[in-house]
């Protein structure tokens, strides 16, 4: 064991490339859970289940299992918010190893579709998040280059990406002293879908200046590489900052990875073009025989345009619809996915498996029904049906040794688990929330009173309702009563959702209202009360699993309480309350046995993914939170002095034309006045939100 500069112990294991930064040794049920899981893997168990309650340190247990086995790992999460949270935590545990993030790179995605009843064709439209695309490329690069890799992904990883072998064959490796013609390098870069751009040098581009070629690798976010040639020989290579041009350090060898997962060698493109032509002829014959002349003309026109593009530049819009021809697969064969990039001995962790497994099963059919219309009406060739996510049985066939992770395992995990490892006792000694049942007839007034108690002591509240309308009405009611409240709903995108959760932790507002978004894995230690309205309405949102998950959101606070508003106690409520009670008793017994006094969880408030979510705004929010704490500690005279200082600073900055500094001083002044006088001094969005 060694230590970092910050004093964090670093643990290594024999034969493992991982260096686990271990701020604290395993405690509670963790040591036994880690031992059993590693033993199960060594014994060759295909499936295991880690039944871990909220706040028991499941992620830390997973990190320990990965470090001890020394194998690459894929961690599946049910949504981007949870994936981002896991990525952030694994980065802290393995800062010296490769921790990667692989989620859908679409900020917006409108798939290609045809509505026969209205004769309406909807073109594919999408907006790609450049930074997430870079992280996806970095993930596949790491899997090819090294073994100490942890990939955190959503279930979008079961959608087809480029063939691993074709991708690997396109890699360009250069060493100092290699004989390489400048034109050959430029051609290889173009084949890898790098764009030559002398003016705007950004990720996935290159520029040529005499004997110097600058390449901005597609999988890098910050560094580019300069290749210096002399007489068709690589004379030197240096990393540099693409923004400032500052040279960083020399390199003796560098590997350029393709700018897209869908790159293919020229020979493969030509082979695919011939296969597409054959399929097109068959399809035209089919439509003609069935007297569908419009469809025959449509498929010919659309496909010939794509063929021309493929022949000339090796790429076309919607190239993924021809993926079967590029990979040489037969009709109906499973597409290549991220899982194919994993080595055979990799580990798979399926986090919140009771949700994730269901998602995997549901992906294929929705995709299939949309594409069948496109094929039937001549917008796409039948091979487009093979550009699809994995079917559930195919996913099962691709699964490596797998550990399901959930506080509420579903039927699939229970049927397939070789062993179930319980992790119920928390190292912090925190006890599961106290569950209180109160009548639904007075739920809103009672909730308002309970919220007031929590706000008075600086704690946060989550409220879950059954319908969108009720969430909106409740949010308006609470806001009218002076409560700082926000509403989390399905229309809010991933980035904004993460920011809302961060703002709740920072104290920008005190109450978060939602429907089905306040469940799995949301890590908010400041929340002391979870209120479940209409808890006696049986259904998906009020099932035993849903109730246990929602109650668990208050399990990270020392005063955690869950209030279920119901006029009758349903069977789901009974089972959820009984299971929570069982876990409370086990934790209390553990605390007594080991002399543990429960202590709250303290967790740094920070941006979840640097670069994906604006780090600048995160720093601003952190500074604001620190200022609020300082303002709270001031007496009246100190507050008056601080207000005068800020007013003077604001006026001086404005006089010197330093408008950004003046605006920052103005915002600090508004915050201080709001804190002291209890009223908002300005309204940025017109609705009281900032």
Swiss-Prot record:
The gene is uvrB. InterPro entries: Helicase/UvrB_N, Helicase_ATP-bd, Helicase_C-like, P-loop_NTPase, UVR_dom, UVR_dom_sf, UvrB, UvrB_inter. ATP binds at residues 52-59. Disulfide bonds: none annotated. This is UvrABC system protein B. It comes from Dechloromonas aromatica (strain RCB). Keywords: ATP-binding, Cytoplasm, DNA damage, DNA excision, DNA repair, Excision nuclease, Nucleotide-binding, SOS response. A motif (Beta-hairpin) lies at residues 105-128. Forms a heterotetramer with UvrA during the search for lesions. Interacts with UvrC in an incision complex.
